[in-house]
Amino acid sequence: MEKLIAHLKSQGFIFQGSEIYGGLANSWDYGPLGVEVKNKLKQAWWNHFVRKNPYNIGLDSSIILNSSVWKASGHIDGFNDPLIDCKKCNSRWRADKLIEEFNSEINAGVMTENQMEEFIREQNIKCPKCQACDFTQIRKFALMFKTNQGVLEDESSSVYLRPETAQGIFINFKNAQRSLRKKLPFGIGQIGKSFRNEITPGNFIFRTREFEQMELEFFFNPSDEKDWFSYWLNEVETFLQDKIQINKENYRVRSHEKDELAHYSTATSDIEFKFPFGWGELWGVAHRGNFDLNAHQEASKQDLTYLDPTTNQKVLPHVIEPSVGVERMMLAILWQAYHEEDLGEGNSRIVMKLPYNLAPYQIAVMPLQKQQNDQAQALYSNLLNNFDVTYDETGNVGKRYRRQDAIGTPFVITVDFDTPETNSVTVRERDSMEQVRINLDELEAYLKAKF
């Protein structure tokens, strides 16, 4: 992992947040190349789950919502972690994580606070920092970032940074349905920032306090006999394998046991990825029932039911939610792509084998020598009309190839001494390093076929 982090920083993918001021813990900035991968990932998700799906539409809801939303959803009262302090070194930990790291077979999420305290005491679980076995009682730690809106700083002006994008979709269910005259079943997709004041964030960008989510809430009539849960789980796997080329051996699907289910869920399956630190949740697909719409209907006193045009009966739709974090998906993609290769005879290379559609640049154009600059520049300008292209003229050809390998550029086009006479260029593919000669009249068609 450390090698990957160092590589991503040196190549302009991800930087430490606020680095010139000593950094800010758990804060990361996406550099010139990282933001390209991130935006292409989000675009791929949007195309697959919203734009190209016959059922779904999009939304962009506010980050700051009326606090009543979070009261109704249960976040204000129930969105917290069990916090415990070491009396010796004053470090703070999540009690449930201490237990689960001590014994991975235990699901501490179903234990009461008293049960967790007793287990920690009986098993003599040690503080990871100082190795002492002396902890405070567990107390609840609210995970939502709280602030004030306007000039007053009292409870009447209290607002929260959203901990998830889902609630913005639920409270806009009727607006979206009415305005576009949508009939069940249909879904609403959203990409946006969320914030959670995690006690123990970590593992690079896997768990951060500021993160981005790609969520879909799919509404359907509870009498609908189609297995929508399996449908969306299959769509998630299709996206992973076909759209962003996550290797099947690198992920697994795990269904939650009854005692693991969230209070709103009747069924949940996690897609877990084999990260460098072990298996971790990548994507969740949850059957939320009508929990959220019912909660907001009761709290707001607004009718959120759907009038079925066939039966003329009002129904409160049920919901399937596929939800994934952008940063976690980024980490999975970048980790899978990173390769150190021995080329023999003392030569090696670092290559980012990114999916072609997610690479920061699709193509690099470079002149073999300065004499070819004008023709190479003209080709570069022409290709910019249809591709994401970079121009590289610094250093010898071998170094430039390695530089493009290191950032994941799929194809490098070299304009050389023969180009003016033959009207052709050399095209090198990243993963195989194979080179072919392509006529300039056929170059664009050749490249389009690759993407």
Swiss-Prot record:
Binding-site residues, ATP:
196-198, 206-211, 281-282, 325-328
What is the top-level taxon of the source organism? Answer: Bacteria
Q: Which reaction does it catalyse?
A: tRNA(Gly) + glycine + ATP = glycyl-tRNA(Gly) + AMP + diphosphate
Primary enzyme class: ligase
Keywords (alphabetical) are: Aminoacyl-tRNA synthetase, ATP-binding, Cytoplasm, Ligase, Nucleotide-binding, Protein biosynthesis
Is Ligase a UniProt keyword of this protein?
Answer: yes
GO BP, sorted A to Z: glycyl-tRNA aminoacylation
Q: Fetch the PROSITE patterns from UniProt.
A: AA_TRNA_LIGASE_II
What family is this protein classified in?
A: Belongs to the class-II aminoacyl-tRNA synthetase family.
Q: What's the protein here called?
A: Glycine--tRNA ligase
Organism (species): Mesoplasma florum (strain ATCC 33453 / NBRC 100688 / NCTC 11704 / L1) (Acholeplasma florum)
